[in-house]
Amino acid sequence: MAKRKYRAVVTGATRGMGYAIAERLLKDGIEVIATGTSEDVDYPNGVSYYPVDFLDDSRVEAFVEYLKQQKIDILVNNAGINKIDEFANIDIDDFDRILKVNLRTPFLLCQAVIPHMKENSWGRIVNITSIWGNITKEYRASYSSSKFGLDGMTVALASELSGMGILANSVGPGFIDTDLTRSVLGEKGMAEVQRQIPIKRLGQANEIAALVSWLVSNENTYISGQNIMIDGGFTRV
């Protein structure tokens, strides 16, 4: 009997890094379930799309139940939201929304897929954090809280699961050249950021996808519990 293909879930996959990750895993021969908030997205054959808003508790609950039936081998928690604000002005509802999408949802999805990974003695979990989950700066309290927390969860998962053949890692992108980054930074901001990056350019979504592709592959047999920065040297040089 031919071995079935690995099956992956990639959240936040309608554009940018998430789309690039879904596309790359498909090229690697992996069946992909992609999520997003759009009702319809054009994907290549081999990608199934599940629309879900992670701020909607009932939709999240339905998606969790769906995943429990899908025999998921690979989970990439990429979906995230952000709001930049001075600490004293942060609205608690905004804070709760950011933690719900960036931390609570990955927690629930991990709980949904890990039982199958344990049964199969194989699994790969990649949580997309951020440079702001490794360092931080002013006006990032909500986002950094969620991303530092997500990395903490990754380390806890690795300590608990790595001996079962389940490897869990975080990937922390820096400034990536996406439509969202361009809209937030503007032309002036883009130029300023590029000057601060040792490589002198923004990263590309396909570079994030390439790293994730390797981390979830059978070539990765010994990396677990790490928060790997992919930022052109921004946080270290």
Predicted regions and their residues:
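Alpha-helical segment proximal to the catalytic Tyr-Lys
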Residues: 115, 159-160, 221
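Short, small/polar-rich loop/turn modules that mediate ligand/substrate recognition or access, typified
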Residues: 162, 167, 223-225
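Active-site helix of classical SDR
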Residues: 110, 146
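Substrate-binding pocket helix/loop in short-chain dehydrogenase/reductase
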Residues: 86-87, 94-99, 193
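C-terminal substrate-recognition "lid" of short-chain dehydrogenase/reductases
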Residues: 122, 202-230, 235
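Conserved glycine-rich cofactor-binding loop
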Residues: 14-15
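Residue(s) in the substrate-gating loop at a strand-loop-helix junction
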Residues: 130
